[in-house]
Amino acid sequence: MHFNLYLKNKFLLYAYGKYFWYLEYTNASQIIAAYEGDKLLGVIIVDMKNEAKPYKSFWKTCYIKLIDQIQKFFFKGGVMAYNQANKEMFEEYTEKYTPDGEIRFLAADPDTKLKGIGTMLLNEFERRKYGKEIYLFTDDQCSYPFYEHRGFERIGEKDIVLELDDKINL
């Protein structure tokens, strides 16, 4: 997600980025990271069905719930539309497929000179969970060809209009 397209306020951008990271991190059963020395190059976060979520945290969960409530109060048009679209697409997907897990997050440092970090992370995950049915949700800011080249199929698409209140300095 490119949150900076929706939020101008640096504090809100930081707070929402933290929320998003905690949400994905605490729902993960698998996290694979790529490093060069101490520098993080990329990460894949996956939630596999029937696997423990070892990264749960009381305080991170409290933070997530607080931001969820703030979103529902201020940004209900955007959040609810997004969640509803994902729910509908998932229901459509599960009519034909039985997923074993979801890729919740995949990112590589765009400033690194090393190429192929995302592919390496996906390959390592596939090695660990070979033959499993995996899905992901993404937005129009992603690289669809990246996923399609690696065997993913685009099953559903929905246009979502984010109704944000312009009275709030975002």
Task: Set out the residue ranges of the language-model regions.
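Helix-loop element at the rim of GNAT/NAT acetyltransferase active sites that forms part
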Residues: M1-L12, N50
